[in-house]
């Protein structure tokens, strides 16, 4: 059977008292098992390197699952144990963008993926 599924990526936005903080993610993608996906999260409205970026996901009918965190200041990362070896988080400070790459995709990776400050 040819398994495919949708991996959805939404826009996360928050409003501060004096400026609008926005995290704008790349669009929905459809991937096959074994493939990889790289999601972008472009930040604006604040100093990118002053905060870390977390990645979470929500599978259908499930709660939020924390995937990991990256420091936008120095690139230090902390990944969920269950994703170790399959996930890589990076940042590009020149464009205030964070990236999350997930490899060797499986059916249970079907989820809505979010970045958050």
Swiss-Prot record:
* UniProt entry keywords in alphabetical sequence: Adaptive immunity, Cell membrane, Disulfide bond, Immunity, Immunoglobulin, Immunoglobulin domain, Membrane, Secreted, Signal
Question: What segment(s) does the record annotate as region Complementarity-determining-1?
Answer: 45-52
Q: Region (Framework-2) spans which residues?
A: 53-69
Q: Where is this region: Framework-3?
A: 78-115
Question: Which Gene Ontology BP terms does the record give?
Answer: immunoglobulin mediated immune response
Give the domain of life. Answer: Eukaryota
> Does the entry feature the keyword Secreted, yes or no?
yes
Q: Where is it localised?
A: Secreted; Cell membrane
Instruction: State the protein's name.
Output: Immunoglobulin heavy variable 1-18
């Amino acid at each position: 059977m040819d398994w495919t599924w949708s991996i959805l990526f939404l826009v996360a936005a928050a409003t501060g008292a004096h400026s609008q903080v926005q995290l704008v993610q790349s669009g929905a993608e459809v991937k096959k098992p074994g493939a990889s996906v790289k999601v972008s999260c472009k930040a604006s409205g604040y100093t990118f390197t002053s905060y870390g970026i977390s990645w979470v996901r929500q599978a259908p009918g499930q709660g939020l699952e924390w995937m990991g965190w990256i420091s936008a200041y120095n690139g230090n990362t902390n990944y969920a144990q269950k994703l170790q070896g399959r996930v890589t988080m990076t940042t590009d400070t020149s464009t205030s963008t964070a990236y999350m790459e997930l490899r060797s995709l499986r059916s249970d990776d079907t989820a809505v993926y979010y970045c958050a400050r």
